[in-house]
């Protein structure tokens, strides 16, 4: 089964305007790198990346008529994604165990979501 581990860092939350030039503390990056290496020995790590702050992003909203483009930051947004891991594991519990070991900062959140398999969309006759 594949799972997304979605990092919701405290530094991006609460409508905080994070400087477009923001980069995480090098010591935290190194610590996270060690965590990623260790996790990759246990789970199949398919992809991972950190995301620039929402101040550097844009959002496309679909409603009636033409889509609307809004440049970041998105003050009305409750939680802002800061990075992700895409892993393959035997169970959600296995992923939760690794998420709990993450060297996250106080106030950070990791959300675990299972990825749909193509079999999940198979039409049943």
Residue ranges: model-predicted function:
Residues 1-125:
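Conserved, structured core segments of small domains
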């Amino acid at each position: 089964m594949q799972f997304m581990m979605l990092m919701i860092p405290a530094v991006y939350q609460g409508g905080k305007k994070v400087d477009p030039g923001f980069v995480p503390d090098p010591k935290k990056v190194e610590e996270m790198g060690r965590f990623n290496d260790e996790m990759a020995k246990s789970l199949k790590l398919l992809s991972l990346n950190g995301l620039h702050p929402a101040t550097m992003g844009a959002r496309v909203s679909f409603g009636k008529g033409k889509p609307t483009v809004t440049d970041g930051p998105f003050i009305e947004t409750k939680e802002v994604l800061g990075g992700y891991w895409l892993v393959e594991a035997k169970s959600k519990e296995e992923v939760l165990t690794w998420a709990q070991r993450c060297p996250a900062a106080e106030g950070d959140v990791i959300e675990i979501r299972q990825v749909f398999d193509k079999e999940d969309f198979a039409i049943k006759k």
